[in-house]
Amino acid sequence: MQDRQKAQDYRALLLADTPLIDVRAPIEFEQGAMPGAINLPLMMDDERAAVGTCYKRQGADAALALGHRLVCGDIRQQRLEAWKAAYQRFPNGYLCCARGGQRSHIVQRWLQETGIDCPLIEGGYKALRQTAIQATWQLAQKPILLIGGCTGSGKTQLVRQQPNGVDLEGLARHRGSSFGRTLKPQLSQASFENKLAVELLKINARQTLKRWVLEDEGRTIGANHLPECLRERMAQAPIAVVEDPFALRLERLREEYFIRMHHDFTHAYGDGAGWQAYSEYLHHGLFAIRRRLGLQRFAELTDTLDRALAEQLSSGSTDGHMAWLVPLLNEYYDPMYRYQLEKKAANIVFRGTWQDVANWLKAQ
């Protein structure tokens, strides 16, 4: 066990999905964490704030003494039991704090007193975070091919089928448009970047990689923005454009946004609350682009959406949604994407149907 007491091979830890018992305060964890980490704090937010204030006013010794007073007795025992349970569940796990300092060492010592020898991450979360940033920069230097196409072209599915494909929208938990949110909340920016770095490392490790295949994304995916090093490379990358018939795109969008999202909401919240959440989701997506549509057009499409929802609720049919989706594509989404694509016309290396692009990718 001695060789595991301090870990410095950060890439190996990230590649192995090493469980991390992260003892930072909840606010620190929410701001940024590694995939596979569970938050079992030594100090809660208010306790950490009090210790920090004490440190500034009275110094390190007084702050340490305050920390021990705050985390003692039943509180200390409850947290110790949680760490013990986590280590028993993840015996290959590591303790992690902000910089591999006192917090992880204190928890390690308390566990040792119970007979558990849990190693820690030397350098803590900060060292892992720096490793993730460096890995993304390094791996972003490899060639990139983008998959482009209007909304409903099946780009994400195509990317997912590639052994060297990176599903940026899946990592961001958002599909990129005003209707793009999923039932899972988006991660913080740092957590998204960390997850992306680990995904790049894993794909790179399991094959001889000639290039990445990514979806042609904007600078942001929902609330997350792409790392600048990756975005700069994507701006110059060649693009294969999917050009499927409009009717086929409509059917994909019907399945994804009206059938699947309705199912997901009702499965998560039950019929009544799920329907309400689904309805609010569609209304919110339309509301988010009201200024670009113009307020009169927004009001017209909202009325059409309301009628479509009433029809879906009464009969289960999603046909009514086509009456607002078709003009939304024709008047907003398609012109916007085509304008963006025109600016990158020199980068287009292939055009074809979804199947044409899939076959072309196999032949590369």
From Swiss-Prot:
Keywords noted in UniProt: Selenium, Transferase
Reactions the enzyme catalyzes: 5-methylaminomethyl-2-thiouridine(34) in tRNA + selenophosphate + (2E)-geranyl diphosphate + H2O + H(+) = 5-methylaminomethyl-2-selenouridine(34) in tRNA + (2E)-thiogeraniol + phosphate + diphosphate; 5-methylaminomethyl-2-thiouridine(34) in tRNA + (2E)-geranyl diphosphate = 5-methylaminomethyl-S-(2E)-geranyl-thiouridine(34) in tRNA + diphosphate; 5-methylaminomethyl-S-(2E)-geranyl-thiouridine(34) in tRNA + selenophosphate + H(+) = 5-methylaminomethyl-2-(Se-phospho)selenouridine(34) in tRNA + (2E)-thiogeraniol; 5-methylaminomethyl-2-(Se-phospho)selenouridine(34) in tRNA + H2O = 5-methylaminomethyl-2-selenouridine(34) in tRNA + phosphate
Enzyme class name: transferase
Cited SMART domains: RHOD
Stored Gene3D superfamilies: Rhodanese-like domain
Domain Rhodanese: 14-137
Keyword flag Transferase: yes
Family membership: Belongs to the SelU family.
Quaternary data: Monomer.
Function (record text): Involved in the post-transcriptional modification of the uridine at the wobble position (U34) of tRNA(Lys), tRNA(Glu) and tRNA(Gln). Catalyzes the conversion of 2-thiouridine (S2U-RNA) to 2-selenouridine (Se2U-RNA). Acts in a two-step process involving geranylation of 2-thiouridine (S2U) to S-geranyl-2-thiouridine (geS2U) and subsequent selenation of the latter derivative to 2-selenouridine (Se2U) in the tRNA chain.
Name the UniProt record assigns to this protein: tRNA 2-selenouridine synthase
Species this chain originates from: Salmonella typhi
Taxonomy of the source species: Bacteria, Pseudomonadati, Pseudomonadota, Gammaproteobacteria, Enterobacterales
